[in-house]
Amino acid sequence: MPARPMHMINSSGQSRPWIGANFWSRTGGPRMWSRYDPGIVREELRVLHEHGLTMTRSFFYWPDFMPAPDTIDEGACDRYRDFLDAHREVGMGTIPTFIVGHMSGENWDPSWRHGRDLYTDVWMVARQAWYITELTRRFHDHPAVIGWLISNEIPIYGGEGDEKIISAWALLMVGAVRAGGGLQPVSLGDGAWGVETTGHDSGFSSLTYGELVDFIGPHVYRMENDRVRQHLKAAFVCELAQVAGKPVIMEEFGLSSDFVSARGSASYYRQLLHSTLTAGASGWVAWNNTDFDDLREQRPYSHHPFEMHFGITDAAGAPKPPLEELRIFSEELSGTDLAGLRRAPTATGIIVPSCLTARSPFTTEEERAL
């Protein structure tokens, strides 16, 4: 029978699931580091912790943290260090994300990029590696840091590319984390949007870069009215992502309450959490921690208003139904030896046609689409 692996992430010497949220404070969204309020951040983390969440994914907004090619903003670093301390105070961890150029429907360049290619411009690659090493050096020994992500959805920021070039870039970026002293698990943050899971050849192949990273992190948002696909596509992607032989972490998932009722949002979370567990996922990081109603005039929310309402808490910090589902799920897992679980063998399997990985000539995008 086909093997059905369930790999666990290992962080701080313990095999345990990550259950958390992607985090921007409601005081600023992507601009939180220039509008940082330590009291509100602690309040936001307290609510998450009280509902069973153990971690967040956090973001170094690139224009703020690297205002010049050879400069790290130490004020932003001081605020991030306080952010780490706030996690430690409530017993939570966080996964910092380095190259945050794309966020919620808009791309944000540092002023000095001037259109340089992130993967092939040697100077630009060196600047990214320096930036990652410098930030890692500052924070790698903080006990709240439990992992690292190179980017946020970089295929829609840096663009797609040749698989060999993308994988060489990934090798250098992961190497920059290790050069800075980071020993925690690391991955790319690319969304696992490669040909293996989508049928579209973006150049980000988990089969190729999988040997460089410690986990694969799908980002799954279903934007359609097919209920079966809505509820099961994330699990399908998790099954396909197992091909890399690494732990699969649901790095981003969620939905805007602009599009669904409170009851429907709870049902979606419940279905996704349990179906991806049975599909081999061993970590879940919801998008995102809060709504942003007070930022309606700020980009990207001014032009993508539905992005304001993916929160698992509202703009005042009150829990929404998805957070209650995360609490229940966390309680269920706390009474389970997740690391000791084995998925039941099955005589069924997913047949992945060779055209997805062989790049056969005269095959079209339509033929590969999943």
Residue ranges and their predicted role:
Residues 1-7, 27-42, 186, 215-235, ...:
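N-terminal-biased segments
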Residues 2-213, 284, 293-294:
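Active-site mouth of glycoside hydrolases
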Residues 24, 189, 251, 351-353:
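Short hydrophobic segments within beta-strands
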Residues 32-33, 106-107, 228, 261, ...:
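Short, solvent-exposed loop/turn and secondary-structure capping segments
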Residues 58, 217-218, 350:
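Redox-cofactor binding/interface segments in oxidoreductases and associated redox assembly factors
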Residues 155-279, 307-321:
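Extracellular glycoside hydrolase catalytic/binding regions
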Residues 278-370:
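Carbohydrate-binding surfaces of carbohydrate-active enzymes
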